[in-house]
Design a protein with these regions (language model features):
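WD40-repeat beta-propeller superdomains and closely related acidic/aromatic-rich repeat-like regions
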Residues: 1-395
Length: 395
């Protein structure tokens, strides 16, 4: 069952029940007036209208949580389907939810699809068993096919740059390839190695823990305040561990912690499992699943590494500010980590037993939603100064 509530009208509510078909996944449409649910066993996708209570069915979706992509303007949606052992893409108009066209794609086992930012092309890629990235026009013409290598695990993550000039392709070979939108050939290959020796202008931030030292000489306390401080120092409260977490800038060369995946288990934790572009399209963040505690930030203007963040725990989630070149990440600890071109910082969440396992920005980049296993909280972040923005855009 899926339930929806109105923020402005608390008395309004909606319940969606597919009955025996079940619901494996649900998502909003861009206009927030429709909910798309995928039934169990990928039997159908149902589009539910919250205005007219009408519904439209799309048969045989390829995936439950993947294989659906909306255009940037929200007018069209592409849905990957499969029938008769063949992959297809259905194009629907979101105003009527009518099928505008359907075309077959040259994939063995389609993994996902995504519209380009300018809504002119659709990127389709195959399962990890077949390295294949296909670029289609909305009318079904195959414009380009890219294959970096054969006979090995292939594509793992794909992401368009905000301007649509580059298509980032992360693979199981621990390499990110940036394809140009004119030639559809790689303009850069970013290799993730465990021994990093440069470039010289890149910065490595390493998370460290250290005792919190309070310089009493720098404080001015009256007699009552001093007595209270002494009594507080004798407390057995667990909050007074006096341990702080911060980033330390370390020099090259740097050895990145590396984990070798077991060869006898499926879905190996290797390759580029996280790939995202900054709002201005200048920076690209990547995470190599072989190195789960490291987050790589690449400068597209210079085609080189800009920063490397080394955490004490596995990086759970990382997300760019939707407005500024600012990155937030979490590791399942009680800390929030942030990076900008000016530097990086660690912030402690002032809530007891709160472990940040996931996060999400709001649309204007002024606040973050932090998720724990059983709770959530909102944090407000300051806007970047004009000086920081100009510095980040100063090529």
């Amino acid at each position: 069952m899926v339930q929806a509530w109105s923020v402005s009208q608390p008395e309004w509510t909606c319940k969606i029940d597919e009955g025996p078909a079940g619901i494996a996944h649900a998502r909003w449409s861009p206009d927030s007036r429709h909910i798309l649910t995928t039934s169990d066993f990928q039997l159908r996708i149902t589009v539910w209208s919250l205005v007219s209570t009408a519904c439209v069915h799309v048969q045989w979706p390829k995936h439950a949580a993947r294989g659906v992509s909306f255009t940037k303007d929200g007018k069209f949606v592409g849905i990957a389907t499969r029938r008769d052992c063949k992959d297809y893409v259905n194009m629907l108009a979101c105003n009527t939810w009518e099928v505008m066209g359907t075309f077959a794609v040259d994939t063995v086992d389609l993994a996902d699809i995504v519209w380009s930012p300018n809504d002119s092309t659709v990127a389709v890629w195959d399962s990890p068993l077949e390295y294949k990235v296909l670029i289609y026009s909305p009318d079904g013409r195959c414009l380009f096919k890219y294959q970096a290598y054969e006979n090995a695990l292939g594509v793992k993550t794909v992401a368009w740059s905000p301007c649509g000039q580059f298509l980032g392709v992360g693979s199981y070979d621990q390499v990110v390839r940036a394809l140009n939108h004119l030639t559809w050939k790689p303009v850069a290959e970013f290799v993730h190695v465990n021994s990093v020796r440069g470039p010289g202008n890149a910065v490595v931030f390493k998370e460290i823990e250290e005792p919190w030292h309070l310089d009493m000489a720098s404080l001015y306390l009256n007699e009552n305040g001093a007595n209270e401080m002494l009594r507080g120092g004798e407390s057995d409260s667990p909050n007074e561990s006096h341990i702080r977490v911060r980033y330390k800038v370390v020099d090259f060369p740097m050895i990145v912690p590396f984990q070798k995946p077991p060869p006898d288990k499926p879905n190996p934790k290797q390759g580029i499992g996280m790939l995202a572009w900054s709002a201005d399209g200048r920076y690209l963040l990547t995470k190599n699943d072989n190195m789960p505690t490291a987050l790589w930030i690449w400068d597209i203007s210079r085609l080189e590494l800009a920063a490397l963040l080394l955490q004490k725990e596995t990086v759970r989630m990382a997300a760019w500010d939707p407005v500024y070149p600012r990155l937030a990440l979490c590791t399942g600890s009680s800390h929030l980590y942030m990076w900008t071109p000016a530097g990086a910082c660690c912030v402690t969440v002032p809530l007891p037993q709160f472990a940040v396992s996931d996060l999400k920005w709001n649309l204007d980049g002024t606040s973050l939603l932090l998720k724990d296993r059983e709770a959530f909280c909102c944090t407000f972040v300051p806007m970047l100064s004009e000086l920081d923005i100009e510095d980040s855009n100063n090529f």
